[in-house]
Amino acid sequence: MKHYELQPSELKIMNVIWDHNPISASEIASILMKETAWSKNTIYTLITRVVKKGFVKRTDPNFVCEPIITRKQIQQQETKSLVDRLYAGSLNMLFARIIEDENLSDAELDELRKLLDQKR
């Protein structure tokens, strides 16, 4: 699996692009200026960064952005990284921690059981 270096600020940019694909840079800026304290220049810099990293394809006119990598690719990578760093690669330890520490409803527990049963 290819490793993607994605900073938290870049992930915010990617989430907007994934949610509104395709989307222009000005629309991204409009959305994020409402959600963050970032300036338009900061947002454009972050967009340029994800384009240069190869995560986003930019087309003119209007600097329209489309994702090259998927949300699922990033989720898989970040999940593996978390499991490796905090749980010595053990998914069992991660699931045990979630089940022990979180206040899961019966519906959530049922959903987890269904997911596990589907993997058998």
Each model region followed by its residue ranges:
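Short, cationic-aromatic polyanion-contact patches
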Residues: H3-S9, P61-K80
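Pre-recognition alpha-helix immediately N-terminal to the DNA-recognition helix
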Residues: L11-V16
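Short acidic, hydrophobic short linear motifs in intrinsically disordered regions
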Residues: I23-I31
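Short helix-coil junctions and helix-kink-helix linkers
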Residues: S30-W38
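A short, conserved structural fragment
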Residues: V51-D60
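Short beta-strand "wing" residues that participate in macromolecule-binding interfaces
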Residues: R58, P67, D106
